[in-house]
Amino acid sequence: EKIDFFVNVLRFIKSNAIALFNETSLVSQSGGQTSRLDSLKNCLLKLKQKKKKTTIGKLYLFSDAFFPFTDTLKLIKSEKLRIDVYAPMGSKNDSLIEKFVKENKFNFIKLSDRHFKH
């Protein structure tokens, strides 16, 4: 299944990993940053440089760990991309994340495991 493939790719990216996939392949990834927000900014910059943003269609975003704040989700919303978000939970702010996801009608899928690579 593609979800298993996406998770396996994510496991090999440095901590604070964000990976963006289309239906069949990795289209952008970033890790080793001080935050997942910075990793997402790098991913989006790479997409824009490749000029894929407008032709990419639906994307799947995978995070190696939970989102401690809504900042990453707010950036996704501001980019107006069709993105399904896959991430584990476990932050003390999970209730804020869940509230934001519900209010903004995100397709948010909870993963059972974290995949840090230090």
What is each residue range found by the language model?
Residues N16-A17, L59, N104:
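Structural beta-strand/beta-sheet cores of well-ordered domains, especially the beta-sheet scaffolds
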Residues A19, Y60-F62, V85-Y86:
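Structural motif
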Residues K74-H118:
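C-terminal binding/interaction regions
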Residues F5-N8, N42, K46, L75, ...:
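Alpha-helical scaffold segments in soluble metabolic enzymes
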Residues A17-T24:
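Short beta-strand scaffold segments in enzyme catalytic cores
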Residues L10-I13, K51-T55, K77-S78, F116:
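Solvent-exposed alpha-helices and their adjacent loops that cap or buttress functional pockets
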Residues E1-A17:
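Short, basic/aromatic recognition patches
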Residues S25-L73:
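Glycine- and Gly-Pro-enriched alpha-helical subdomains that act as flexible
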